[in-house]
Curated annotation (Swiss-Prot):
GO terms for molecular function: ATP binding; P-type potassium transmembrane transporter activity. Residues 73-103 are annotated as: Disordered. It comes from Bradyrhizobium sp. (strain BTAi1 / ATCC BAA-1182). The system is composed of three essential subunits: KdpA, KdpB and KdpC. Keywords: ATP-binding, Cell inner membrane, Cell membrane, Ion transport, Membrane, Nucleotide-binding, Potassium, Potassium transport, Transmembrane, Transmembrane helix, Transport. Part of the high-affinity ATP-driven potassium transport (or Kdp) system, which catalyzes the hydrolysis of ATP coupled with the electrogenic transport of potassium into the cytoplasm. This subunit acts as a catalytic chaperone that increases the ATP-binding affinity of the ATP-hydrolyzing subunit KdpB by the formation of a transient KdpB/KdpC/ATP ternary complex. GO terms for cellular component: plasma membrane. This is Potassium-transporting ATPase KdpC subunit. It comes from the Bacteria. It is a single-pass membrane protein. It is found in: Cell inner membrane. InterPro entries: KdpC (IPR003820).
Length: 201
């Protein structure tokens, strides 16, 4: 019996060692050597302080900043552990809203957001990504169209010409990966940091 079981035990121990210890350690070393910033979470710092990650969206409410996609992340209800409460941009609880296309709550929220954005920029079509959440609820990027839609508000709040803000947006647009994958996008945190750093006139 032991003769038949021994090979299985040895294979299990060998695979556990390889896949559970050696491979993860090797990948950690390789990632830390070749892609140190990404391995640390693509953190963004200002004046030596970590202010965010290029991979996780943040909430910007001030009119002088570009706003990202809406977030549907939640947290446990402190009064009832069987329920959740909205907790936007909560990276510990990444998730979508799970509201389907027939949901009245979703339709009402979309209408409210669209109406608010139309009032902000009358006559312009509202980009879809400004009123919808992503699957993770934490997308850090918006489309170039969503960024350009917000230019009049940001320019007015900062008292600078729209053309200066448009130029800055154009500089922050990232193209498709390898020219094929994904869509052009703008990282909202990077754009807002560039906005603060720029001497716009």
């Amino acid at each position: 019996m032991l003769k038949e079981v021994r090979p299985a035990i040895l294979v299990m121990l060998a695979l556990t060692l390889i896949t559970g210890l050696l491979y993860p350690l090797a990948m950690t070393v390789v990632a830390g050597t070749i892609f140190p910033a990404q391995a640390e979470g693509s953190l963004i710092t200002r004046s030596g302080q970590v202010i965010g990650s290029a991979l996780i969206g943040q909430e910007f409410k001030d009119d002088k900043y570009f706003h990202g996609r809406l977030s549907a992340t939640t947290a446990a209800d402190p009064n009832d552990s069987t329920k959740t409460v909205p907790a936007p941009y909560n990276a510990a609880n990444s998730s979508g809203s799970n509201l389907g296309p027939t949901s009245k709550a979703l339709a009402d929220r979309l209408k409210e957001e669209v109406d608010k954005l139309k009032a902000e920029n009358p006559g312009q079509p509202v980009p879809v990504d400004l009123v919808t959440t992503s699957a993770s609820g934490l997308d850090p990027d918006i489309s170039p169209e969503a960024a350009l839609f917000q230019v009049p508000r940001v320019a007015k709040a900062r008292g600078v010409p729209e053309a200066s803000i448009r130029t800055l947006v154009a500089q922050q647009v990232k193209g498709r990966l390898l020219g094929l994958l994904g869509e052009p996008r703008v990282n909202v945190l990077a754009l807002n940091l560039a906005l603060d750093a720029a001497k716009l006139q």
